[in-house]
Regions:
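Entry beta-strands of beta-propeller and related beta-repeat scaffolds
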Residues: 21-29, 68-71, 107-111
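Loop/turn residues immediately N-terminal
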Residues: 34-37, 75-78, 115-118
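Conserved Ser/Thr-centered positions that define the repeating blades of beta-propeller domains
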Residues: 40-41, 80-81, 120-121
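Enriched but not universal
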Residues: 2-5, 10-23
Length: 131
């Protein structure tokens, strides 16, 4: 059974498949059931928990962005400068709706939310609706 599907550009993200990225020599993913951050140094053969606190909410999407790792969570946009070991809030206002996924648009960040497409030219600190 398929769950919700969100579209970011041409990439489809199904909630039944965990979000996974390469960051340096590690694979980092969102655990498919727990919605926490895990990492692998064995090309995905085994996984270890990297961040399991609930203070950020449930993780939904990950995006490497410059020297940061950005995350969409159930509480908003969070960022990490430690490969996901710790997280700080970047944007938690509900004015954009619920964030679903992020995409690096070059000069701006793009975000699909429950209220439509938004963009940010401030690394996700503020958002404007794309018209």
């Amino acid at each position: 059974m398929r769950k919700k599907m969100y579209l970011c550009g041409i990439i489809s993200i199904y909630s039944i498949m965990p979000q996974m990225i390469m960051l340096g020599s590690e694979m980092i993913r969102i655990h498919p059931a727990k919605k926490t951050i895990e990492y692998s140094t064995s090309q995905g053969r085994s996984w270890s928990t990297r961040y399991s606190s609930t203070s950020c909410g449930e993780f939904i999407d990950l995006l490497p962005y410059g020297n940061e790792l950005l995350a969409v969570t159930s509480k908003g946009i969070y960022y990490s400068t430690s490969q996901g070991r710790s997280w700080s809030s970047r944007y938690t206002s509900s004015s954009c709706g619920e964030f679903q996924c992020l995409m690096d648009g070059g000069r701006e960040l793009l975000a699909q939310t429950s209220n439509g497409l938004y963009y940010s030219t401030s690394s996700g600190r503020s958002w404007s609706k794309r018209r």
